[in-house]
């Protein structure tokens, strides 16, 4: 379904809940909330490059500001004086707790306190509903306990759990921590929203795109562009099989890190996706062949930004760059890899609308 159609459906849907999206990025969470029928009135993010995709696709106000500088009265102004229930949504940057940062000390990073800034804004604005999405390891961090304590003190009914993307139609193995909090009653997070055994795959998501060689671009879609590979990485890709590892290669193709005793820790590096399975978690480095299992299942290249966006669950015509702006893989990597998959926003949005229709206490 085209994104223009989703926007039309959103305009026809119930506007009983109005959302402000903190740390909105390019709009993944907002996209899912809109798909569920929630009206998104604004997004806030410190990255100015996210303004165009957010405003273009979500058709809501983008506020270029650090969440640290935002106040509850600012949020009141964004929500306005309507009769809608207020939802404050967001995904604070997760780098301190990410499984990609092996051995990182969360106390050595400043980003962890953004969750407490989120909690401050909840206390200052007292929205009817709150939702947060983040990495699963955050669940055991002291800062998360502090955040929960603040919500409970304010009188919120709270639910949170680790959610698997494949249980909600995402063609990706991503697991995330999802939280709901409500002043209107308990909002349970569903375990799954697709039938048991129904799994979306890489083939389902990207098989219909035109084939490309490494370094080529689809003339009809600038985001369907494959990063060039070095000669040795092209040889490595040719020697790889879907679902395999670098152990399938001849010795001369193996990197120095693979020859060390610790090399067994990097089984998925230089890996190739399988057609009939979900993709691995899409990270900001999906365009780098050596950074994970990001090889295309049969074409001798890494996945493109468009393919990464589809594996994240974005609509096929979601736009990330203004017309004529050159593709920068690092910028798009952050936009797409850091995005909340819309499927997670949609499952929370539907749960909140169900709670509005049938409140429980």
What are these regions (language model features)?
Residues 3-129, 136-149:
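Core alpha/beta nucleotide-donor-binding catalytic domains of modification enzymes
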Residues 22, 136-140, 168, 172, ...:
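Aromatic-acidic/polar surface patches that form glycan- and anion
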Residues 52, 145, 149, 204, ...:
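A broad, structural surface signal
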Residues 73-84, 95-269:
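Class I S-adenosyl-L-methionine
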Residues 90, 178-181, 280-284:
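Short hydrophobic-aromatic micro-motifs
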Residues 92-93, 127, 171, 315, ...:
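Proline-centered helix-kink/hinge sites
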Residues 224-361:
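C-terminal target-recognition/interaction regions appended to catalytic cores
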């Amino acid at each position: 379904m085209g994104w223009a159609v989703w926007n039309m459906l959103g305009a026809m849907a119930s506007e009983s809940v109005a959302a402000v999206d903190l740390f909105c990025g390019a709009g993944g969470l907002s996209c899912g909330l809109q798909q569920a029928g929630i009206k998104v009135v604004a997004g806030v993010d410190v990255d100015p490059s996210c303004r165009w995709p957010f405003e273009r696709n979500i058709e809501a106000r983008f506020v270029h500001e650090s969440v640290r500088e935002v106040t509850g009265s600012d949020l009141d102004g964004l929500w306005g004086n309507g009769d809608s229930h207020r939802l404050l949504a967001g995904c604070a940057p997760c780098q301190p707790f990410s499984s990609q940062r092996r051995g990182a000390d969360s106390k050595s990073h400043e980003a962890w306190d953004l969750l407490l800034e989120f909690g401050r804004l909840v206390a200052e604005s007292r929205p009817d509903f709150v939702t947060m999405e983040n990495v699963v390891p955050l669940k055991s961090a002291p800062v998360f306990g502090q955040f929960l304590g603040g919500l409970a003190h304010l009188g919120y009914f709270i639910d949170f759990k680790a959610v698997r993307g494949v249980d909600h139609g995402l063609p990706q193995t991503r697991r995330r921590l999802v939280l709901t909090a409500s002043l209107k009653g308990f909002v349970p997070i569903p375990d799954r929203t697709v039938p048991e055994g129904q799994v979306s795959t890489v083939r389902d998501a990207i098989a219909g795109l035109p084939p490309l060689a490494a370094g080529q671009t689809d003339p009809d879609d600038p985001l369907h562009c494959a990063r060039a590979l070095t000669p040795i990485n092209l040889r490595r890709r040719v020697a790889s099989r879907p679902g395999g590892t670098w152990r399938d290669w001849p010795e001369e193709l193996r990197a120095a890190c693979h020859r060390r005793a610790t090399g067994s820790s990097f089984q998925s590096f230089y890996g190739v996706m399988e057609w009939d399975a979900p993709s691995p978690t899409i990270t900001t480095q999906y365009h780098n062949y050596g950074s994970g299992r990001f090889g295309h299942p049969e074409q001798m290249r890494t996945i493109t930004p468009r393919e990464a966006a589809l594996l994240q669950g974005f609509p096929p015509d979601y736009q990330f760059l203004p017309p004529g702006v050159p593709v920068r893989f690092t910028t798009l990597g952050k936009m797409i890899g850091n995005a909340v998959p819309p499927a997670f926003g949609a499952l929370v949005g539907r749960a909140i609308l169900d709670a509005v229709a049938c409140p429980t206490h």
